Amino acid sequence: IKSNYCFVHGDTLSTLLGSFFVKRNRGNLVLLEAGHPVPGIFKHFPESVIRYIVAKISNKLIVNGESQINQLKKWNVKGSILQISTNTIYDSFIGVELNQNHNKNKVTVAIHRTENINNKIKLKLLVNFLVQISEQFDINWYLHIPTRNKLKSYNLLDELTDGNVKTLDLIQYDEFINELFSSEFVVTDGAGIVEECQLIGVPTLVWRDE
């Protein structure tokens, strides 16, 4: 670790723990997609806090826009900022073959942010919405483990099943991109999925306040 650069990405707990491990071992920490603007340090908690902490301790920060640079300047980061032309998400698309078969009745759902899954009222509103539109669309909800656990603890899984909403385990990246691509629209709270849908031209309903 001491002689190499270690790259981290995102705003999850694993991002934070990995960053602490690198710094503890005196490694050089590189943060990809650094400086995404946040509405407030304690909004989108804990994601915004994680973004801030990791940015502050990174040696190098990779950005692809002026808004990210401005955010990092507001945070007064000490690491060097390197601007690239496009988001690193483009690299993920290399080698992904898109299936041209579209299902105009399918809606793909991916919800995982803490602000949504830890709030029973918000999660119940989402479940009600999905059950309502399931009369018109085939709903496939790909569940992260924390999301599934919260739905179970709130006794909402049965409501989804009774409402003909399919709850599925996560799948491989290229398979998931094709699920997005073949959907009529996507419901998500993930910034990465929003960008992916923009790249492949799929309408997206962003399920978060800001």
Indicate residue ranges for each PLM-predicted region.
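A nucleotide-sugar donor-handling region in carbohydrate enzymes
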Residues: A55-N119
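A short beta-strand/loop micro-motif in the catalytic core of glycosyltransferases
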Residues: S58-G65, I139-W141, V186-V187
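Helix C-cap/helix->beta junction micro-motif
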Residues: N25-R26, I133-F137, I200
